[in-house]
Amino acid sequence: MTVRTRFAPSPTGFLHVGGVRTALFSWLYAKHHNGQFILRIEDTDRERSTQESVQAILDGMAWLGLNFDEGPYYQTERYARYQQVAQQLLEEGKAYRCQCSKERLEALREAQLAAKEKPRYDGHCRNQSLPDSGIPYVIRFRNPDAGIVSFHDEVYGDIHVDNSELDDLILVRSDGHPTYNFAVVIDDWDMKITHVIRGDDHINNTPRQINLFKALDAPVPVFAHLPMILGEDGKRLSKRHGAVSVLQFKELGVLPHALLNYLVRLGWSHGDQEIFSVQEMITSFDLKNVSRGVSSFNYDKLYWLNQHYQKSDSPESVANALQWHFEQAGIDLNQGPDLKDLVAVQAERCKSLAEMCQISQYFYTDIIEYNEDAVKKHLRPVVLEPLMVLHERLKALDEWKNDKIQECINDVSLQFDLNLGKIAQPLRVAVTGSGTSPSIDMTLALLGKNKSIKRLEDALEKIRARASVV
C-alpha cells in the first residue's frame, strides 16, 4: 500500500500555525513512508473563500518547503462529481430528499433544547418518497439506525459512538452545493487517501464520515487527530498572541526550517532531542509519538531555535534569507559589505533576521540616525582630541583590516592614557549612531575606510559644535 496523506485548508483567511503543523505532520508521515502528499483546497464556502487566501496558502507552503506531490485540487471544480455520488446514494436508498422548512427545523431545535435534549434532525422526511417536484429540498444521508461506529485514532486510541447519537446529516444543500462532510469523504475516496491527519476539532465528524465511506463501499482511511495549539495564557491561539500566519513569521525574520523544527516539537517527541534537521524529522517521525495533550506556543523557544540556526547554518544560506528583509526596507545592498560577512558577525547578536536587518542598516546607508542619548553620553568635548588623532591614524592606514584598525585604537588609548572603552565607545557612536555594534574593529572593517572616515569627520564636527556651545 502506498501511503497517501493530504492537507486540506479552507481559503477563508491566512494559513495559521495550527494548519501548518497539520500540513507538516501529514507531509512528514508521507515522506517517512515514501508515500505521497496531496494538497486540496476546500473552497466550498463561496462567501468567505478568496483567491488571496489561496495564494497565501501556496506561498506559505512554498516558503516552508512543504512540497506536494499532487494538487492543488479545488472542491469547486468537483461539483459534478459530488452530484453524481449524491444521485447514486438516492437511487440506492442510502440518502433521501428532505423538504423541511427552516421554520420547522428551528421550531424542532427550540423544542428539543427546552426538553433538554440534544438538538438533532428527527427524520421527518426519512420515510417519505418525495419526488423532485420543484419544491426546494436538501439531500440527507440515511444514517444507520442501530449499531456502533468504532475506529482507532492514531492519537486518541479506540473510539466508539452509538449510531443513535448521530442524525441524518445533510449531503447537498438546497442550492445544490455539497456540505463539508460529504465533499471531504468523496475527495478522500477519489484521491485514495490512506491516512487523514487533521486537527481534533474534526474528531466529532469522523463517525459520520466513516458511515458515509461504508455506504459507498469505499475504504475507510486511518485517522489521526492532533490536539490544538494554545497561547501561553492557555487560550486558543489567536492574533492577540502575536503572529499566527505563517507568512507573518517570515516578516518577523524566522527561518523556515526553524519554524518547522519548532512546530514538529509541538505535540510530538523523539526522546529528548530538540534540534532536528528536516531530514531527521522525516526519518524519525511516527504518529505513535504524538501527544494527546494540548501544546502552548512559546515565542521565546521559537526565537531560541531561530538564533541556533542563524549561527549554525552557513553564512551564505542565512544571507540569502536575510536579503529579502533588506529589500523590503528599500536598502541598497551594493552600498555596504557582503551579506554573508555581515551574518558572520551579527548572527549571534540577533534573535531574528528582521532584527539583524534593523540593527545593520547603518552599514548600507550614507546617512545614519544618531541616538541622542548615546551622543550626549559619548560624543563630548573631552574626546575631541583623541578622536582627532585617531582620525589621522586611521586615515593613514594602507591596509583596512581588523588588526590594523585595532592597533590604531590601542595606540591612541595608550597615548592619551584612556581606558580602551573610553575611545572605542565614542568611535562606535560616531560611525554607527548608537552605542551597540559588533566589535569596533570589525564594525569599521565592514563599513569600509571611506565610510568610516567620513562618519568620524561628521562626528568631530558635532563635538566641535557642542564644545562651542559649552
Swiss-Prot record:
Question: Which reaction does this enzyme catalyse, per its entry?
Answer: tRNA(Glu) + L-glutamate + ATP = L-glutamyl-tRNA(Glu) + AMP + diphosphate
Where does this chain carry the motif 'KMSKS' region? 236-240
Main location group: cytoplasm
Specify which residues bind ATP according to the UniProt entry for this protein: K239
Q: Does the keyword Ligase apply?
A: yes
Keywords assigned by UniProt, alphabetized: Aminoacyl-tRNA synthetase, ATP-binding, Cytoplasm, Ligase, Nucleotide-binding, Protein biosynthesis
Q: Which InterPro entries match?
A: aa-tRNA-synth_I_cd-bd (IPR045462), aa-tRNA-synth_I_codon-bd_sub2 (IPR020751), aa-tRNA-synth_I_CS (IPR001412), aa_tRNA-synth_I_cd-bd_sf (IPR008925), Glu-tRNA-ligase_bac/mito (IPR004527), Glu/Gln-tRNA-synth (IPR000924), Glu/Gln-tRNA-synth_Ib_cat-dom (IPR020058), GluQ/Sye (IPR049940)
Q: What is its EC number?
A: 6.1.1.17
| Protein location | Cytoplasm
| UniProt keyword Plastid, yes or no | no
Q: Which family does it belong to?
A: Belongs to the class-I aminoacyl-tRNA synthetase family. Glutamate--tRNA ligase type 1 subfamily.
Q: How does it assemble?
A: Monomer.
Annotated protein name in UniProt: Glutamate--tRNA ligase
Whose protein is this, by species? Legionella pneumophila subsp. pneumophila (strain Philadelphia 1 / ATCC 33152 / DSM 7513)
Q: Which gene encodes it?
A: gltX
